[in-house]
Regions:
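Membrane-anchoring hydrophobic helices of lipid-metabolizing enzymes
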Residues: 2-96
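Non-catalytic C-terminal accessory region of glycerolipid acyltransferases
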Residues: 2-15, 148-275
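Catalytic core of membrane glycerolipid acyltransferases/transacylases, capturing the structured
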Residues: 44-68, 76-77, 92-146
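Short, conserved catalytic or adaptor-binding loops enriched in Gly and charged residues
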Residues: 73-75, 134-135, 217-220
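Short gly/ser/thr-rich secondary-structure transition/capping motifs
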Residues: 77-85, 144-148, 208-211
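Short glycine/serine/threonine/alanine-rich loop segments
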Residues: 80, 141, 194
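Alpha-helical membrane-embedding segments
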Residues: 85-101, 131, 154-156, 221-223, ...
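Structural alpha-helical scaffold elements that stabilize or flank donor/cofactor-binding regions
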Residues: 90, 135-136, 157, 188
Length: 275
């Protein structure tokens, strides 16, 4: 080990940096909780008072603004470094499915912070959460508890001109570089006849990944980078397309920064074909 790291003069710096990391961790959690709870409280009366043609645009604008402010605050205090500018080119591209990989809980926050007309399929426990539920309902986000209803609502949102955020893995990544992909993305795109825009989220940290304790301090700053992948036409055969999409993600992310533990399972080497 480098002797300089063990020298007495380095100890104060290391302790100060550790204290800063704890401050940044708690600041981020409290700030996100405050933003979410404030908007959720305001969303309840708005949901019942305003007509739906107003509530959905208002709800999505507010969530985009809140998430963008939150990420800006994390950047300002030096906790994270975000490169999300690639998403800006999608804003005026019309209805499509935006399909990123899913390394951590901040993935949806990052995407929605840049795309204000985004519908989102959410887990039931998030929609029912006191911090997020009312705001999610105001924005017209879709519950994933009943698959047939979920697919119908997703297709309807796309037909109304919304963009739709779906994580093809269905949950946060536990197999390097991506989990097995689910068929929902291809099925919805096929029925709505919209393209699928792949998005790659790269990070150097396992923070808020699957199994990461909420209050565990990560090394900071954390880097997040988003880049756009290929945009695919609506698939004709959902099953075959899903397998090809998974191989495409594997090939594109194989050399990305490795954030999973060394003993995490690995996807088999492959070369995407037929896309």
């Amino acid at each position: 080990m480098n002797a300089a790291l063990l020298s007495p003069s380095s100890l104060p710096r290391r302790w100060l940096h550790r204290l800063y990391e704890y401050f940044a961790l708690w600041f981020g959690l409290v700030l996100l909780g405050a933003i979410s709870l404030t908007w959720s409280t305001l969303s309840v009366p708005l949901y019942y008072v305003l007509p739906k043609r107003w509530t959905v645009p208002l709800g999505r604008w507010a969530i985009t603004t809140g998430f963008r402010s939150y990420l800006g605050a994390l950047s300002l205090i030096g906790a994270c470094r975000f490169d999300l500018s690639a998403l800006d080119s999608l804003r005026d591209d019309g209805p499509m499915i935006v399909a990123p990989n899913h390394p951590c809980l901040l993935d949806a926050v990052m995407v929605i912070s840049r795309l204000p007309n985004m519908a989102c399929i959410m887990k039931v426990d998030i929609v029912d959460n006191v911090f997020l539920g009312a705001g999610a309902r105001l924005a017209g986000y879709i519950r994933n508890d009943a698959q047939l209803s979920m697919i119908k609502q997703a297709v309807a949102e796309l037909n109304r001109g919304s963009q739709l955020l779906i994580f093809p893995e269905g949950t946060r990544t536990t197999r390097w570089p991506v989990n097995v992909c689910k068929g929902t993305t291809a099925l919805i795109a096929s029925r709505a006849r919209v393209p699928i825009q792949t998005v790659f989220i790269e990070t150097d940290s396992a923070y808020l990944g699957k199994g990461w304790p909420l209050f565990r301090r990560p090394p900071m700053p954390i880097t997040y980078r988003v880049r756009l992948g290929r945009r695919f036409d609506p698939p004709e055969r959902a099953g075959t397309f899903t397998e090809d999409l998974e191989r495409y993600f594997i090939d594109e992310l194989r050399d990305a920064p490795h954030f999973l533990p060394p003993d995490a399972p690995q996807a088999a080497e492959s070369r995407a074909v037929g896309l």
